[in-house]
Amino acid sequence: MPAPRAQEAVTVSVFAQRFSATRRGARLARRLATHRLDLWDLPYGSPASDTVTLVVAELAANAVLHGRVPGRDFEVRLTYDRTAGLVRVEVSDTHPGHPELSDAAVRPSADADGGRGLLVVEAVADRWGVAGRTGPGKTVWAECAVRVPDGPRPVRA
């Protein structure tokens, strides 16, 4: 009988969830993303968690406010590559309109209630963009470099 081989460490983790295209859905997306990051050893209140959570909050809010199609949900997908020290955030909706990358360069007036979501994402993410998806709509994505925790991952019960 061959000797047992050691299991390779999991270096990529994925979280994906669909949410109702409502403000409540956007809040829930942000909260669940923060919880998932904590489970991935990017703890609450850490710079990595705060940055990724902010990106999720802005992209989810945009999906609800600008990408909402009645009766359709939006999806959030987080991919954490521990080896690369990178979290990729993807928010997909079914609205056919695509934000222009140049939209982030248009500054809203100081007293405007909104219009800063992509500016915030551009400021805190290392890269971001828009991609098509299977079916109607688009995926707005952002990548955030994160500090990889030192030492072995703690075992959670």
Regions found by a protein language model. Give the residues of each.
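Conserved beta-strand-loop-beta-strand hairpin that lines the nucleotide-binding pocket
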Residues: M1-A16, S20, V64-A157
